[in-house]
Amino acid sequence: MELTTDIADFTRRDIELNGKTKPVLVTGSTGPAVIVMHEIYGFTPTVARFCRWVRDAGFRVYAPILFGEPTAENAEKLTIARQVSLCISREFTILFANKSSPVTDWLRALARLAHQECGGPGVGAIGMCVTGGFALSMAIEPVVLAPVLAQPGVPALSSAALDIAPDDLKHVVARTRQGLKLRGYRFEGDELCKAQRFSTLHQTFGEAFSGTELPDSAGNPAGFKAKGKPPHSVFTGDLIDAQGQPTRAAVDEVIAFFRGALR
């Protein structure tokens, strides 16, 4: 699928929930809802492409804009200003472990709204990078039936820890005992989402968590590798959009996970 900054096939909605209004880009008119949370760069052409793949599989996609502009013109470039703003923001818990980011309260409300609008058994949710763990915190909401953690890179100061409050974590564990399944994705050499975090997820959730670790050789040469770093962004900048590529197969796997849980 071609990468483009043109998002005429998305509709911007300014949605007020819990007293806070955020722009949400919506695409698709039928099917169960899936919430796609962008990376630290904001909403980019590669995030829009992923949303379209999910939409074309028969889902209605809600992409909340948590930072950056509500367009696909955000560059896949991390700025010091963005890092500082996230670290001092009251909505995000970036550095420290065992805390749920306050913004996840709003995201759970969005999940409830999306479920009301779309119907079906429930809602899917995928977070990426700095938002990766948000899908885990969202899973305390009963309508969230298919949480996916893509290269969860937070908390930044502890490679094995999770960015979720202990009581929230207990709630998610209880849901897995009732049948909830979770999926996670990372590259083997990822320095931002290390293997220790997936080990914690396996230890915490057992067979309810399915973690896929892709070889670094599967990363796009034009992505993080071009900067001399191991690949990181499984479904966006480090994805190779070609048949037989492990990253493209991972997209199909996630879509199958959504179908299995939401239909």
Segments from the language model and where they lie:
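The conserved SAM/SAH-binding core of class I Rossmann-like methyltransferase domains
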Residues: Y62-P64, A150, Y185
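Primarily recognizes the serine-hydrolase "nucleophile elbow" in alpha/beta-hydrolase
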Residues: R108-I164
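Gly/Ala-rich phosphate-binding loop of Rossmann-like dinucleotide-binding domains
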Residues: R55, A139, H202
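Short, hinge-like loop/turn segments at secondary-structure boundaries
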Residues: L78-Q83, A165-D167, P230
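The feature captures the conserved acid-bearing segment of alpha/beta-hydrolase catalytic domains
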Residues: P155-S217
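N-terminal targeting or regulatory segments adjacent to alpha/beta-hydrolase or S9 domains
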Residues: M1-I7, T27, D56, T236, ...
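C-terminal catalytic histidine-bearing segment of alpha/beta-hydrolase fold enzymes
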Residues: A208-R263
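Serine-hydrolase catalytic machinery in alpha/beta-hydrolase-like enzymes
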Residues: D6-G122
